[in-house]
């Protein structure tokens, strides 16, 4: 109540010209709380809700509940313990790239308050796989599943993309319960071309094979699951290609969806480039999820992203 009444409005006022200020303010405080066991216990006691009815066992991972925090919130893994204490069933951290990169120039997040939406063109700002590996080696892993989203560095040529992904996979393998292959951000030039059938097939084949090889080297009984995150702007033919590749390459889950380049239905006009998320994407995300569900026939789990801002209505997946 205090957060909604006082803290949130103050954060919005002070970050009106650059919403990223509010995000960094919150992340820094969550990072501080992550180093206090007392604070973590208090946060968990106030937020955690446990019920056997909510538990799920999917691709060899036990989830205490099916509601997770999507990638992009904690890009560098600085606040995972505090975020886990909020009651999430899992956290997807990242996206991480092989090389540290600042992302695109600020401001790069824009609020569309009338539409309950955001436009972002972040461009995968992160500390890089090496630095994040060192950080995670020093921190205690939260009790809930942690997945890491991996993407292509901006400086890496398209023809070297596979090795770029594999480098991050190797660096983060010991600290992750599953991996998300991000090929759908609209803010890295050429990244979405990796969703095309042939490059997607080559990329996912290499990542799954490397995950299996790493499992053997570490005497792990099973390889870490590999998931893929797709764009909402794909046509049905493109979705069919994604489904075919995922089934062929033993992809363990499809995350639907990332942000959209479309601006359909907006009441608040904006000329800013980037990916749109929030309420205007709700319908399209559900359309993609339904299409995947109808054509996958329960062969691969589907993780919906950004389609819930509260209790879902009857009939929603």
Placement of each model-derived feature along the sequence:
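An N-cap/entry alpha-helix motif that binds or orients negatively charged groups
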Residues: 2-56, 120-125, 129
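Conserved, mostly hydrophobic/aromatic
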Residues: 18, 69, 91, 132, ...
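Glycine/Thr-rich beta-alpha phosphate-binding loop at enzyme active sites
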Residues: 34, 38-49, 186-199, 244-298
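Short beta-strand/loop segments at the ligand-binding rim of alpha/beta enzyme cores
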Residues: 60-68, 142-149, 213-234, 294-305
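Catalytic cores of alpha/beta
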Residues: 76-85, 234-248, 293-294, 298, ...
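A gly/proline- and charged-residue-enriched helix-loop-helix capping module
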Residues: 94-144
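Active-site-adjacent beta->alpha loops and helix N-cap segments on the catalytic face
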Residues: 99-108, 129-130, 187-222, 235-237, ...
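Active-site glycine- and acidic-residue-rich loops that bind
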Residues: 153-166, 193, 199, 227-248
């Amino acid at each position: 109540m205090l957060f909604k009444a006082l803290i949130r409005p103050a954060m919005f006022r002070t970050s009106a010209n650059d919403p990223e200020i509010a995000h960094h303010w919150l992340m820094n405080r969550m990072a501080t709380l992550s180093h206090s066991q007392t604070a973590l216990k208090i946060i968990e006691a106030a937020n955690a809700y446990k019920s056997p009815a909510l538990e799920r066992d999917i691709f060899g991972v036990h989830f205490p509940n099916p509601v997770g925090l999507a990638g992009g919130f904690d890009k560098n893994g600085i606040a995972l313990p505090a975020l886990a204490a909020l009651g999430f069933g899992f956290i997807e951290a990242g996206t991480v790239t092989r090389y540290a990169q600042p992302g695109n120039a600020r401001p790069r997040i824009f609020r569309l308050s009338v539409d309950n939406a955001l436009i972002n063109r972040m461009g995968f700002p992160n500390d890089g796989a090496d630095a994040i590996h060192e950080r995670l080696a020093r921190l205690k892993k939260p009790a809930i599943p942690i997945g890491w989203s991996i993407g292509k560095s901006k400086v890496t040529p398209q023809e070297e993309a596979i090795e770029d992904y594999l480098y991050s996979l190797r660096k983060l393998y010991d600290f992750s319960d599953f991996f998300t292959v991000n090929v759908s951000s609209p803010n890295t030039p050429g990244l979405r071309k990796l969703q095309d059938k042939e490059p997607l097939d080559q990329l996912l084949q290499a990542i799954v094979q490397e995950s299996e090889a790493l499992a053997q080297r570490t005497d792990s009984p099973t390889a870490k699951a590999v998931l893929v995150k797709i764009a909402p702007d794909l046509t049905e033919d493109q979705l069919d290609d994604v489904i075919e590749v995922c089934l062929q390459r033993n992809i363990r889950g499809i995350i639907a969806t990332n942000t959209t380049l479309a601006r359909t239905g907006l009441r608040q006009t904006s000329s800013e480039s980037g990916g749109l998320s929030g309420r205007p994407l709700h319908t399209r995300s559900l359309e993609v999820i339904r299409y995947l569900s109808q054509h996958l026939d329960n062969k691969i789990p589907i993780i919906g992203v950004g389609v819930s801002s509260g209790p879902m209505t009857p009939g929603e997946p």
